[in-house]
């Protein structure tokens, strides 16, 4: 698999050079390209390096440091490409990147606007914690019935001070926190995935599915993976790992 990913990275064109059979420019991040191949290569190398001691002893005859180095270099190929860029704010992550086909996306499966054809994104972890106001059939009190939930106080500890992620990832954090605790239970309202398909029957609206692509890899993921690679490589790579983490915080 690693050899095939290396070959793909060699022969596939960059994203901006992709064309269909008629020579038309491709715009979908679901089309395999050089950047996606490097992302795949990085993950394959990292998985094999990190899983060495889970393998049978007879299958451990390889240098994991070499694989961490290969993964780090593949990550760098994606990061240094001018075709991908981090968005500026956490709000853009929610409203653009997680919806799909953004400048930060590296590879994804197109599901937005086609959920009736390719399968509903109902069956995802999001349905276990997303309620009001993403799902119009729910009121704010339903959060207390969820198995997966988080206190607003915990959110503020996770994203302290001026960190705006707490306001992008959770709906009206301050306003809902001020609401009667008999309704909210003191819990926050996840709002990271908010692009949804709604069915309407008469005057009633109901959540049908998430209306977004399946994001396999985005640039922030690649920064995070490179940081992990650099930690395993150690030495003068540690400083670079810290820089990568600070870049995507």
Regions found by a protein language model. Give the residues of each.
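Elongated scaffold/linker segments in the mid-to-C-terminal portions of large proteins
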Residues: 74-233
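Extended, hydrophobic/aromatic-rich amphipathic alpha-helical segments that build helical scaffolds
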Residues: 1-12, 27-54, 64-79, 107-109, ...
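Surface-exposed patches in mature extracellular/periplasmic domains of secreted proteins
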Residues: 14-24, 85-90
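Amphipathic alpha-helical surface "interface" segments used
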Residues: 22-38, 92-104
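Generic detector of short alpha-helix boundary/capping microenvironments
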Residues: 23-25, 30, 59, 208, ...
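Short, solvent-exposed loop/turn and secondary-structure capping segments
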Residues: 50-58, 117-122
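Intrinsically disordered, low-complexity Ser/Thr- and acidic-rich flexible linkers and loops
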Residues: 21-23, 54-63
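Residue-level signal for secondary-structure boundary sites
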Residues: 16-18, 52, 115
């Amino acid at each position: 698999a690693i050899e095939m990913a290396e070959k793909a990275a060699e022969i596939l064109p960059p994203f901006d050079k992709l064309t269909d059979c008629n020579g038309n420019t491709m715009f979908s991040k679901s089309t395999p390209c050089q950047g996606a191949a490097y992302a795949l290569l990085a993950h394959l190398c990292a998985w094999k390096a990190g899983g060495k001691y889970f393998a049978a002893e007879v299958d451990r005859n390889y240098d994991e440091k070499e694989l961490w180095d290969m993964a780090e270099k593949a990550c760098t190929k994606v990061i240094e490409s001018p075709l991908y860029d981090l968005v500026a704010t956490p709000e853009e992550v929610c409203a653009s990147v997680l919806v799909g086909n953004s400048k930060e996306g590296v590879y994804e499966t197109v599901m937005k606007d086609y959920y009736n054809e390719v399968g509903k994104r109902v069956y995802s972890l999001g349905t276990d914690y997303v309620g009001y106001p993403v799902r119009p059939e729910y009121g704010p009190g339903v959060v207390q019935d969820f198995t997966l939930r988080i206190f607003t106080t915990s959110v503020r500890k996770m994203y302290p001070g001026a960190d705006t992620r707490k306001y992008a990832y959770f709906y009206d954090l301050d306003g809902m926190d001020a609401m009667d605790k008999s309704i909210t239970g003191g819990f926050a309202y996840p709002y990271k995935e908010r692009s949804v398909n709604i069915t309407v029957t008469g005057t009633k609206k109901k959540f049908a599915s998430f209306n977004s692509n399946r994001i396999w890899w985005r640039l922030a993921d690649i920064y995070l993976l490179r940081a992990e690679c650099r930690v395993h490589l150690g030495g003068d790579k540690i400083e670079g790992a810290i820089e990568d983490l600070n870049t995507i915080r």
